[in-house]
Structure formats: C-alpha cells, structure tokens
C-alpha cells in the first residue's frame, strides 16, 4: 500500500504554454508526454462509491496497472489517501490479487468481481517534471486530455503535485511558487469525481447552501475549528466550479463561503488569536476587492490572489498553523469539548439576535443584515452536536428573516421575526434544555 499525497490544480486552457515554460525553468528532471488510458469500474448499485473506493485499470505503452484508491482526507485539493497498485499482464480486473485490507469486511465480497463493469474512461497525455523541494522529492504532472462517459465528455487540463518522498509541507511550499502566475485554480474534484458525474447523466450542478456542520461525538474545540474552516473551503471551491461554468448565483455563494472563513476565525477568536490568521485575512481582503471590481469569473478564479488565498487556507489547515500561537491557557481551551463550547456560544448568539430583533426596526432592518448573516453562519457551525431536525427548524426562522429582509417583504419580516425570537433553545443552557 502507498499513501498518496497530492495537490490538484485546474489549469486555464489559455495558460498551458506559459505554465509549461515556467515548469521548464525549474531545476529537475523532465519527462516527455506519454499517453495514459484509464478505465474506471463500478457496479450498477455503485457499491464501490458507497464504500468510498475507486477502481481503475491504467494502460501505458502496453503495460497495465490495476489500482484501488480508498477515501482519505481532502482539504482544498490536497488529497491524502491509501492507494493499492497491482501490475497486471492485460487490461482485465483481477480483484483477488488485492490484499484483504482493501475490502471493508476484510475479504472480497461474494459476486463483486462479476458485478463490476466499466463506467467511464479518461484518456490524457501526462508530461512530468521531477523536482526537489526542501527535503522532499515531488512529481509535477501536467495532464491534458478528456474524461468520457457514454455520450458525455469533459476536458482534462490539470496540474498535480504528488509527494514521492518527504513531507506534505514541501508540496505546499512548491505550490506557493507556482501560483504566483495566473492560470491555476486549486480544485478538489478529481478526474474520477467528474467521471461519475458524467456517467450519472451530467446533470447541471446546483447551488449548495451551507448546511449545519456535522461533527463527530466527543469532538474537541480544535476539531470543530478545523471542521468549520474545511466546510468553508469546500463551499468556496464547489461554487467556484459553478461560477466558472456560468451558473447564476454562484459568485454570491463564493463570497458567502469566504465570509464563512472569516466568521469561523471570529467564532474561535477567543482561543485562536487574530495574529495567527492575520496573513490569511489580508489575502481574503485582496480577493474580495478583486471580485468586487466586476472582473470575469475566469480572471477572478484563476488569479494569483485567489490561488494564494486558498493555498494559504489549505496550508493553515494541513499544518495546523494556529498551534504555534497558543499559550498554555489557550491550549487547554482548544483541547476542551466542542459541545460545551457550542452550548456557551449558541446562548450568546441567541441573546445577541434577541437583542437586535426583540422589537420592530421599521425601515432599519437592512442595517442589521451583516450581523444577522454572521450569527446564522456561527449557529450553522455550532449546531452539529445536536438533533438535526430541531436545529434546522430553529435556524429556518432566522434564515427566513434574512431572506425577507433581503427581498424587502415587510409582512414576512415581522412574521419571521416574531417566530424567531419566541423559539425555545434546542441546546443546553443554564443547566437545562
């Protein structure tokens, strides 16, 4: 088994030549393009997908390799996951050759070998550069081609930085050097993810409202902090993809995701000091200014400013860049229970909302939109330790108020305001529910 660690970028098609020139200037070993054909397999009921596995056969120059990838952690396009590779003599699956730990129950499921069929394919030219960064050996791969499923296809124009040996931090360090020029967009959608989407009919991708952040039982405050930033980054990248594809409303969701990053930093700001995220917040300000200038989606998304901001957030998460700024007292707080933290802050946010909206505001509601949105974001981040339906029902009235204010529906404003301020808490408060 290998532990695959790689960082993915989407390359703007018009920037390929400039990128290739830039890569040739690096000190390293260049490999001319070779053609890679890949067939991905799945069952009719998506057994592999449901068990977070990806199965393919890759062919290059008459040689074949069977690969099983198992879901790991993806943060902003940095993939860290187990990967099993088996050399085979011909392009036919030999599932019995995988080690037993590949399978969820420790053994190849009965009948699975007969049920897996080709689902989609990728065909691309891969050009490589092998470079040293810090104490690490890194492969840079430029992939140009297409992913195809039935009548649907989509271009592949990607750059991957894969750690061959060394440390993930060096991959991020190398990436920082590459994103100084325009044309790169950190992407979390793998070739396989795009292939599955095509195979399922290539339905239009829809806006994805931020949902209540789910956390594991007994999570620490630090785990909650990480989860909040990962959620914000995921929303940012998802809606960037939609924005560049021309989906209406996607730009607003990108800006909302960036605001969620800020709200996360503020929510945990009593523990993680502002100086820990000062550089990140400065970069966010630059990107927000760029997007406010009404540039095109391509200009904004593939800009060095945007790429640097997302990469900095990714690095902040992967390296837990806040830890060096914590004193002993803060370390104790961040190791404490996230649920206890959530109880305290849910009560504070509810009290703030009741203070603001406890009485009619006439024509002054618009002045409170930013505060209302910030409080809703915080409650979305804090509510995951509780019963989902109860938390959603409580939030819906505040979200309804937000929408009514935005759309200036005066009757609806008062309806949702009255409903929202009269709700009972769904969390522990003052020692009771």
Spans of features found by a protein language model:
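Function-determining surface determinants
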Residues: 1-433
